[in-house]
């Protein structure tokens, strides 16, 4: 194997190598320091007289005397069923003190988006135990449903709660969680590890942790390692896999940092012009393949810079994914957990996974009525601030009280409270006792009211 010593420049995480034989895009590179230490890298760009290599580790010690060896293959992830229960670094190395992974296969981490013709229709309900998701923004198997948060909000706690509680009710199929955290602090990493071990959720999970002080380049690899693992578990071993990626904002910042080091022409707010395509190459790896037993469902979590939903990261994510769950600073200030605002939240595939035989026959009607009642109550709060509560009609006051009850009884729940879909819908019916039946009948069939309304239950 040839070793080149033609490094012309080191800029950030990048090495510029001159006069090499033809190499491939994304080819793996071994970097040999003067003291014999080896570091990993990958070909980022190539032309006739220059190759750009990104280093997966710190560039300390790299210089003109660094040896560069091109390995002739792309980054491959060693995968095995024994990965379940393991905690790995953002680069795929075990950090839980356990043995190295003995692979059944080595798979290219870049994978490929599912052929649209081969895609199955997502339809099976995934129960997260969180009412605001299960009841009004239902997650279905094979969907990609992001969570939009802001700095200082409890998105990490929500992510862990989903990882602990997610299941497909009534199904005997094997279920697994792949959890990938990018750009987190060491304190957050310890919190994640302790929670997984405390609750026993680690037994059915594979965890990847990329720390804030790890190289930015590794951050661009972490979600691909997680998805490669998920695809192996799903399509080769038949698992139904939920992939949680947090925080995609840190991933996009790494893209911007690498783009700046390459002196690329920036796009919106300094992010690379290809960020949409790059995000799509991650999100579109969710889904179901016809004829195969398993599935990959994604929940990417991102923090919106400045709580701005029009920022390029949430904006582009919204174009690719199938809805969004929005975490509200206002609800968080009220001390409500989880502070999920159902009004701007949406699950575009919800109707495929709910109803008779999947959740319950009243699910759609109850969801619509709760959404409508809460929206009207929130609008009335603005009116109360101007004219006062006493100026409202009796009907309007009931909707105002319904909005308060919705936040206090439906949205609010404990971080370890795992509600079934039946419990979630029954909470909704319990709140409907505050509204006149004439209002309920505008959206809910009379026979459903007589079946589920507490006033008619014996």
Curated annotation (Swiss-Prot):
<keyword id="KW-0375">Hydrogen ion transport</keyword>
<protein>
    <recommendedName>
        <fullName>A-type ATP synthase subunit B</fullName>
    </recommendedName>
</protein>
<keyword id="KW-0472">Membrane</keyword>
<dbReference type="GO" id="GO:0005886">
    <property type="term" value="C:plasma membrane"/>
</dbReference>
<comment type="function">
    <text>Component of the A-type ATP synthase that produces ATP from ADP in the presence of a proton gradient across the membrane. The B chain is a regulatory subunit.</text>
</comment>
<dbReference type="Pfam" id="PF22919">
    <property type="entry name" value="ATP-synt_VA_C"/>
</dbReference>
<keyword id="KW-0066">ATP synthesis</keyword>
<dbReference type="InterPro" id="IPR022879">
    <property type="entry name" value="V-ATPase_su_B/beta"/>
</dbReference>
<dbReference type="InterPro" id="IPR027417">
    <property type="entry name" value="P-loop_NTPase"/>
</dbReference>
<comment type="similarity">
    <text>Belongs to the ATPase alpha/beta chains family.</text>
</comment>
<dbReference type="InterPro" id="IPR004100">
    <property type="entry name" value="ATPase_F1/V1/A1_a/bsu_N"/>
</dbReference>
<dbReference type="Pfam" id="PF00006">
    <property type="entry name" value="ATP-synt_ab"/>
</dbReference>
<dbReference type="InterPro" id="IPR000194">
    <property type="entry name" value="ATPase_F1/V1/A1_a/bsu_nucl-bd"/>
</dbReference>
<dbReference type="GO" id="GO:0005524">
    <property type="term" value="F:ATP binding"/>
</dbReference>
<dbReference type="Pfam" id="PF02874">
    <property type="entry name" value="ATP-synt_ab_N"/>
</dbReference>
<dbReference type="GO" id="GO:0046933">
    <property type="term" value="F:proton-transporting ATP synthase activity, rotational mechanism"/>
</dbReference>
<dbReference type="InterPro" id="IPR020003">
    <property type="entry name" value="ATPase_a/bsu_AS"/>
</dbReference>
<keyword id="KW-0406">Ion transport</keyword>
<keyword id="KW-0813">Transport</keyword>
<dbReference type="InterPro" id="IPR055190">
    <property type="entry name" value="ATP-synt_VA_C"/>
</dbReference>
<keyword id="KW-1003">Cell membrane</keyword>
<comment type="subunit">
    <text>Has multiple subunits with at least A(3), B(3), C, D, E, F, H, I and proteolipid K(x).</text>
</comment>
<dbReference type="GO" id="GO:0042777">
    <property type="term" value="P:proton motive force-driven plasma membrane ATP synthesis"/>
</dbReference>
């Amino acid at each position: 194997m040839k070793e080149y010593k033609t490094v012309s420049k080191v800029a950030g995480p990048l090495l510029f190598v001159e006069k090499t034989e033809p190499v491939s895009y994304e080819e793996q590179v071994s970097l040999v320091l003067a003291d014999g230490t080896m570091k990993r890298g990958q070909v980022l760009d190539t032309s006739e007289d220059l190759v750009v290599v990104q280093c997966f580790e710190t560039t300390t010690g790299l210089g003109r005397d660094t040896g560069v060896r091109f390995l002739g293959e792309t980054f491959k992830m060693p995968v095995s069923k024994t990965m379940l229960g393991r905690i790995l670094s953002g680069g795929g190395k075990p950090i839980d003190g356990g043995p190295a992974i003995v692979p059944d296969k080595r798979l290219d981490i870049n994978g490929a988006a599912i052929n649209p013709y081969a895609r199955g229709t997502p339809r099976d309900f995934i129960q997260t135990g969180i009412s605001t998701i299960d009841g009004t923004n239902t997650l279905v198997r094979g969907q990609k449903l992001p969570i939009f948060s802001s700095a200082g909000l409890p998105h990490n706690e929500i992510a862990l709660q989903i990882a602990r509680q997610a299941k497909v009710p009534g199904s005997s199929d094997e279920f697994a969680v792949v959890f990938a955290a990018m750009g987190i602090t060491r304190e957050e990493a310890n919190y994640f590890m302790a929670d997984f071990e405390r609750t026993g959720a680690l037994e059915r999970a594979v965890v990847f942790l990329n720390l804030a002080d790890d190289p930015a380049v590794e951050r661009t690899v972490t979600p691909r390692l997680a998805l490669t693992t998920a695809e192996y578990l799903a399509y080769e071993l038949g698992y139904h896999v939920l992939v949680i990626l947090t925080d995609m904002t840190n991933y996009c910042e790494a893209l911007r940092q690498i783009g700046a080091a390459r002196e690329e022409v920036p796009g919106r707010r300094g992010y690379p012009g290809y960020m949409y395509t790059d995000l799509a190459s991650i999100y579109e790896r969710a889904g179901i393949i016809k004829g195969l037993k398993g599935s990959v469902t994604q929940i990417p979590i991102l923090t919106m810079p400045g709580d701005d939903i029009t920022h390029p990261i949430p904006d582009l994510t919204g174009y690719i994914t199938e809805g969004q769950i929005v975490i509200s600073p206002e609800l968080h200030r009220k001390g409500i957990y989880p502070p999920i605002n159902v009004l701007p939240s949406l699950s575009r595939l919800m109707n495929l996974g709910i109803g008779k035989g999947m959740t319950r026959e009243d699910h759609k009607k109850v969801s619509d009525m709760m959404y409508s009642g809460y929206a009207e109550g929130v609008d009335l709060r603005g009116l109360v601030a101007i004219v006062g509560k006493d100026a409202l009609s009796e009907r309007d006051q009931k909707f105002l009280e319904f909005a308060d009850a919705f936040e206090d009884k439906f949205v609010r729940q404990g971080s370890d409270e795992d509600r079934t879909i039946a419990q979630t819908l029954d909470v909704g019916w319990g709140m409907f006792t505050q509204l006149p039946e004439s209002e309920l009948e505008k959206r809910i069939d009379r026979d459903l009211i007589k079946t589920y309304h507490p006033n008619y239950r014996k």
